[in-house]
Regions:
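H-loop/switch region of ABC-family ATPase nucleotide-binding domains
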Residues: 206-207
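Conserved beta-strand-loop-alpha-helix hinge in the C-terminal portion
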Residues: 226-252
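The feature captures the beta-strand-to-loop junction immediately N-terminal to the Walker
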Residues: 38-40
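Helix-to-loop junction immediately C-terminal to a conserved catalytic motif
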Residues: 53
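A short, flexible loop at the N-terminus of ABC-type nucleotide-binding domains that lies
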Residues: 1, 10-24, 74
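ABC ATPase NBD coupling module
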Residues: 15, 69-83, 91, 113-120, ...
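Conserved ABC transporter NBD signature motif
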Residues: 61-69, 229-231
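ABC ATPase C-loop
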Residues: 162-163
Length: 264
C-alpha cells in the first residue's frame, strides 16, 4: 500500500547548520496497517510525514502508494490518496467558513479543479450523516463558523474531513497532543472507530508511549533520522513502556531524554 525505499532528507546542505533529517528510510505499510511512530524531538517523525504528504520532497529514495511512485507529485495532487490531521486544531480547517463549507471543501479534495464547493440537498444529508457519527452534536451546528468551535470539536471535524473521501493513507501527526486529557481521549476513541470501520491504512505519530503501544497493530521507533525499532503486532501485545524504553537505550546507547515524551 505505502512504500518508502531508501528515503533520505538533508536540511541546509553544505552549511554550518547542515542536519540529517532522514537517512535510508525503508518502510512498507500493508493495507489496513495501523502503525504508531514514537521518538524524541529531532528524530525525523514530522519530516517523514511531510515527505509522505508532499510538503517536502526527498533528496534521495522513492515514495509509492499502491505501486505508483508519488514522490515527484505536489501536495495537492497527493490529496486524492492521503488524508492528514495535524497537531494544531487550527490547522486543516478554514476558521471563517462554516462547518458545512469546510466539509464541502473536503468533499472535493483531490478532485478536478473548478469543482464547486457548493452544497445540494443530497450532499448536505451526507454531511449530517457523517457528523452524527462523531456523537458530539456538530450535526446541529452545520452553519456555525469553525473558528467558534472548541479545540476538541475542531480536531474531530479535522479527522472527519481527512477521512471523508476514504483516503488510501491516513497520516495523524500528534493529533491529540494539543488537547486536554478528556478531549484527547475523545479524539483517540473516534480515531480508533473511524480507522477500524473504514479499514484505513494509518501512520500515527505520538509522544505518548502508552498510546503508541495500545493503538494499532505495529510500532516503529525513530532516532536521529533512522527507524531503529519495528515492533510487530504479536510482540506489541505484551510490550510495556519500561521494555520500550529499555529497547531504545540498548539500540541507541542513550536514554530517551525528550521531556515531551509521555510515559503513559
Amino acid at each position: 500500500m505505502l512504500q518508502l525505499s531508501n528515503v533520505s532528507k538533508l536540511f541546509n546542505p553544505g552549511s554550518a547548520d547542515e542536519k540529517i533529517a532522514l537517512i535510508g528510510i525503508n518502510l512498507t505499510l500493508k493495507p489496513g496497517d495501523f502503525v504508531t511512530v514514537i521518538g524524541s524531538n529531532g528524530a525525523g517523525k514530522s519530516t517523514l510525514m511531510n515527505i509522505i504528504s508532499g510538503v517536502m520532497t526527498p533528496d534521495a529514495g522513492e515514495v509509492a502508494i499502491s505501486g505508483e511512485t508519488i514522490h515527484h507529485l505536489p501536495e495537492y495532487d497527493r490529496s486524492r490518496w492521503i488524508g492528514r490531521v495535524f497537531q494544531d486544531p487550527m490547522a486543516g480547517t478554514a476558521p471563517r467558513m462554516t462547518i458545512e463549507e469546510n466539509l464541502a471543501m473536503a468533499y472535493t479534495r483531490g478532485k478536478k479543479r473548478g469543482l464547486s464547493f457548493g452544497t445540494n440537498a443530497r450532499r448536505r444529508a451526507l454531511f449530517l450523516e457523517q457528523l452524527q457519527r462523531l456523537g458530539i452534536g456538530l450535526e446541529d451546528r452545520l452553519r456555525a463558523k469553525v473558528g467558534l468551535l472548541s479545540g476538541g470539536e475542531r480536531q474531530a471535524l479535522s479527522l472527519l474531513m481527512a477521512t471523508f473521501t476514504q483516503p488510501q493513507i491516513l497520516l495523524l501527526d500528534e493529533h491529540t497532543a494539543a488537547l486536554d486529557p478528556a478531549r484527547a481521549e475523545l479524539i483517540t476513541r473516534l480515531t480508533e472507530e473511524i480507522v477500524r470501520e473504514m479499514k484505513l491504512t494509518t501512520l500515527m505519530v505520538t509522544h505518548n508511549m502508552e498510546q503508541a503501544i495500545r493503538l494499532g497493530n505495529r510500532l516503529i521507533m525513530m532516532d536521529k533520522g533512522r527507524i531503529i525499532l519495528d515492533v510487530s503486532e504479536e510482540r506489541k501485545k505484551d510490550l510495556t513502556v519500561e521494555q520500550l524504553l529499555g529497547e531504545f537505550e540498548n539500540i541507541s546507547g542513550s536514554k530517551l531524554s525528550d521531556d515531551r515524551v509521555v510515559l503513559g
